[in-house]
Amino acid sequence: CQNQKNEWKETYHLTYFYLKDCSNCQHFKKNVLPAIKKEFGKHMKIKSYDMDDEQTFDEMKETYQNHIDQIIDFDEDDYGYGPMVFLEGYMAILGAGNEDDYVEHLVNAIKGEKLNEAAEIETYYYLKDGKVQKS
């Protein structure tokens, strides 16, 4: 039985914030990002921000704050943790579990389908103007 390949027409935007020494961020970069690229190809524009980089710190902090401000009921205890991933206009996910499941979260969000349960390490966040709303 073959996995039905999705045909993406639009371009989506993913913004993520990471820390160099965070093992889950490394897992996201090494395993999850390639899986996202494989699924979406050129239809997913990805922008990353290193939360440790002093040279881009001010720009990163402003962008991070703007993104956090879009979240409904953000848990301040999660502030500054990574990987913090925003599927622009849809939702945000803090933490990354299995890469295939993660890609499925994004696919379901974009298609407007019910999200699978988040992995233990993941937290779904909903955006004030996001297309995905808490069910």
What is the predicted role of each segment?
Residues 25-40:
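Typically the conserved alpha-helix immediately C-terminal to a functionally engaged Cys/Sec
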Residues 79-132:
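Non-catalytic, surface beta->alpha helical segment in thiol-disulfide oxidoreductase systems
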Residues 20-27, 84:
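C-type cytochrome heme c attachment motif
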Residues 19-23, 47-49, 92-94:
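Second-shell loop/turn segments in exported
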Residues 29-33, 57, 61, 103, ...:
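Extracytoplasmic/secreted envelope proteins and their assembly/folding machinery
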Residues 17, 41-60:
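Thiol-based oxidoreductase modules, predominantly thioredoxin-like and allied folds used
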Residues 61-91:
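Short, structured active-site "lid" loops
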Residues 7-21:
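Short active-site neighborhood of thiol/selenol oxidoreductases, capturing the structured segment around
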